[in-house]
């Protein structure tokens, strides 16, 4: 019988080349980096995770993120450990330290997916993240595809960029990203006015669904990450609820099928 996966999203560093306007890491008064664990402690966490997966009778899967995980001094030793124990992993990072040689190294160590962010069209994205970030991200999609790592594009939806995302998904498809998905922005205390209203968000889902239908045969998988997709599709008659009063349709999977570790 095939086991289900238990996933860990592992923040191994705060170090980053960007200062995204919606980033929670630098949202407070303290702009310094949090201390990083050394390789010995990272190994301890890794083996504890493997033991947990064994207890739960599930297969381990890890998404390594930050900051930019490629900036951690021990990242390559950590990824080599994943390979030694045959644990598949994804990188959630930036384009700036990614090149053909790095991509090949990641592939050899077992990297399945490399996720980068696009938070609007060029002007908006570079305003949110960093000048030059938009072009750098698009250019690295090809680098990943060439070595056989799935290129994933993720978007954070806010009032700043919501009108551009239906166009942005077309850009991601044109550049042959292997997947595209988005999440709602969770504002910090100083940025509540950037939160999208429920009616705006429902209209946005409608526009995105129309785009997904038009582009469904272009080779990009559209990840319906937001829990509200099920309600949206149910209202359109495209999602059926089983007749079972004990069935839980959706909700937070934390501790059930995934955990997040800040280290």
Where are these regions (language model features)?
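Hydrophobic faces of well-ordered beta-strands that scaffold small-molecule active sites
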Residues: 6-8, 60-64, 89-91, 114-116, ...
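Conserved radical SAM core fold
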Residues: 30, 69-71, 95-100, 114-131, ...
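Glycine-enriched alpha-helix->loop->beta-strand junction motifs that scaffold or abut catalytic
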Residues: 109-113, 175-178
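A short alpha-helix capping/helix-coil boundary motif
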Residues: 55-59, 80-84, 118-121, 146-150, ...
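Conserved alpha-helical substructure of the radical SAM core
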Residues: 1-112
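Radical SAM enzyme [4Fe-4S]-AdoMet core and its adjacent flexible, acidic
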Residues: 32, 128-263
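Glycine-centered loop/turn positions within well-structured domains
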Residues: 18, 123, 151
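Conserved residues at the C-terminal ends of beta-strands
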Residues: 26, 65, 117, 183, ...
């Amino acid at each position: 019988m095939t086991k289900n996966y238990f996933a860990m999203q592992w923040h191994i560093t705060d170090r980053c080349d960007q200062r995204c306007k919606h980033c929670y890491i630098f949202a407070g008064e303290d702009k310094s980096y949090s201390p990083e664990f050394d390789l010995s402690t990272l190994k301890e966490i890794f083996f504890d995770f493997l033991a947990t997966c064994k207890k739960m009778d599930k297969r381990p899967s890890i998404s390594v993120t930050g900051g930019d995980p490629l900036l951690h001094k021990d990242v390559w030793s950590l990824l080599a450990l994943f390979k030694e124990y045959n644990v598949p992993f994804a990188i959630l990072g930036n384009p700036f330290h990614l090149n053909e040689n790095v991509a090949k190294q990641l592939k050899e160590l077992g990297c399945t997916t490399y996720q980068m962010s696009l938070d609007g069209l060029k002007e908006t994205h570079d305003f949110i993240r960093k000048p030059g970030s938009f072009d750098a991200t698009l250019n690295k999609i090809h680098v990943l595809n060439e070595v056989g790592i799935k290129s994933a594009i993720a978007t954070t939806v806010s009032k700043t960029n919501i009108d551009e995302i239906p166009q942005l998904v077309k850009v991601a498809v044109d550049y042959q990203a292997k997947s595209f998905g988005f999440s709602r922005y969770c504002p910090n205390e100083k940025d509540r006015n950037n939160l999208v209203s429920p009616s705006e968000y429902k209209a946005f889902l409608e526009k995105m669904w129309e785009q997904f239908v038009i582009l469904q045969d272009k080779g990009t998988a559209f990840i319906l990450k937001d829990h509200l997709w099920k309600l949206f599709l149910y209202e359109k008659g495209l999602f059926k609820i089983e007749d079972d009063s004990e069935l839980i349709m959706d909700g937070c999977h934390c501790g059930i099928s995934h955990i997040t570790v800040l280290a």
